[in-house]
Amino acid sequence: KYYGNGVTCGKHSXSVDWSKATTNI
């Protein structure tokens, strides 16, 4: 599932796609 800001999460983990997220830092 995609939450915006480069963050994607599955049932047991989540990760950040920094190539997308860095625009919001």
From Swiss-Prot:
- What GO terms fall under cellular component here? extracellular region
Q: What's this protein's function?
A: Bactericidal activity against a wide range of pathogenic bacteria, including Bacillus spp., Enterococcus spp., Listeria spp., Staphylococcus spp. and Streptococcus spp. Has no activity against Lactobacillus salivarius, Staphylococcus aureus, Streptococcus pyogenes and Streptococcus suis.
Identify the InterPro entries for this entry: Bacteriocin_IIa, Bacteriocin_IIa_dom_sf
Q: What is its main location?
A: secreted
Q: Decide whether keyword Secreted is in the record.
A: yes
Q: Give GO BP annotations, semicolon-separated.
A: defense response to bacterium; killing of cells of another organism
Q: Which residues form a coiled coil?
A: none
User: Disulfide pairs?
Assistant: C9-X14
What are the UniProt keywords, alphabetically?
A: Antibiotic, Antimicrobial, Bacteriocin, Disulfide bond, Secreted
Protein's cellular compartments: Secreted
What organism does the UniProt record list as the source? Streptococcus mutans
Carries keyword Transport? no
Name recorded for this polypeptide:
Bacteriocin mutacin F-59.1
The UniProt similarity line reads: Belongs to the bacteriocin class IIA/YGNGV family.
